[in-house]
């Protein structure tokens, strides 16, 4: 194969904390250009770094984001098949709707701004609830967060209180690796010593 001269444009995503292209620093949110004569078998190595950070959300609360992924606190849940017939179509298990109810408390707030990222090899199913390819450990405080009146298992839009009752280290995982989850949480003020 004959060499060919052309420009290669590599888009560096803005959600990256840092990037290199063939060892050269590239700026997130910009295009990194390589103009040269290319030979058969040459490769371009793009390395992106990501930072776990709290991102403001509705009602003064926050989500945990790392790169393009949003992370959620998975909740233990129990599901019930909801079989019915509508417009002459019978919905019977397993091809029916399911009602999913939490089996643990959902009232948590972020209790710090340092996070520990755990990466694993991607398995046969990348959206696995049991073995997600990445998790982020975070300090969370248990808080009072009630259910909507008359709707057990459906949390109110905002917590009843931000007074912490217990601190726990919990693993959050990508939103797509959860069934029942808390994604938007309040953050307690962080005090530095």
Mark where each language-model region is.
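Glycine-rich phosphate/pyrophosphate-binding loop
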Residues: 1
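Surface-exposed beta-strand/loop patches in extracellular or lumenal glycoproteins
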Residues: 4-13
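Short helix/loop capping segments that flank catalytic or ligand/cofactor-binding pockets
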Residues: 7-8, 19, 74
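Short strand-coil-strand connectors
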Residues: 13, 22-24, 65-67
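Solvent-exposed beta-strand/loop surfaces of large extracellular or lumenal domains
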Residues: 16-37, 52-59
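Short, flexible surface segments
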Residues: 40-41
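C-terminal beta-rich recognition modules with glycine/proline-rich loops and embedded aromatic residues
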Residues: 47-193
């Amino acid at each position: 194969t004959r060499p060919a001269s052309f420009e290669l444009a590599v888009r560096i995503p803005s959600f990256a904390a840092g990037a290199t292209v063939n060892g050269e620093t590239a700026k997130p949110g910009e295009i990194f250009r390589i103009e040269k004569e290319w030979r058969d078998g040459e490769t371009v190595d793009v390395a992106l770094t990501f930072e776990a950070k709290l991102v403001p959300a509705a009602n003064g609360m926050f989500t945990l984001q790392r790169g393009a992924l949003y992370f959620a606190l998975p909740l233990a849940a129990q599901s019930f098949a909801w079989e019915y017939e509508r417009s002459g179509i019978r919905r019977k298990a397993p091809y029916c709707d399911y009602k999913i109810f939490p089996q643990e408390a959902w009232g948590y707030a972020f209790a710090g701004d340092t996070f520990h990222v755990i990466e694993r090899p991607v398995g046969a199913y990348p959206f696995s609830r049991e073995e997600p390819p990445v998790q982020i450990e975070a300090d969370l405080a248990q808080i009072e967060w009630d259910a909507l009146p008359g709707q057990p298992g459906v949390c109110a839009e905002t917590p009843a209180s931000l007074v912490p009752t217990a601190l726990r280290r919990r693993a959050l995982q990508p939103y797509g690796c959860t069934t029942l989850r808390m994604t938007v949480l309040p953050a307690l003020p962080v005090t530095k010593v």
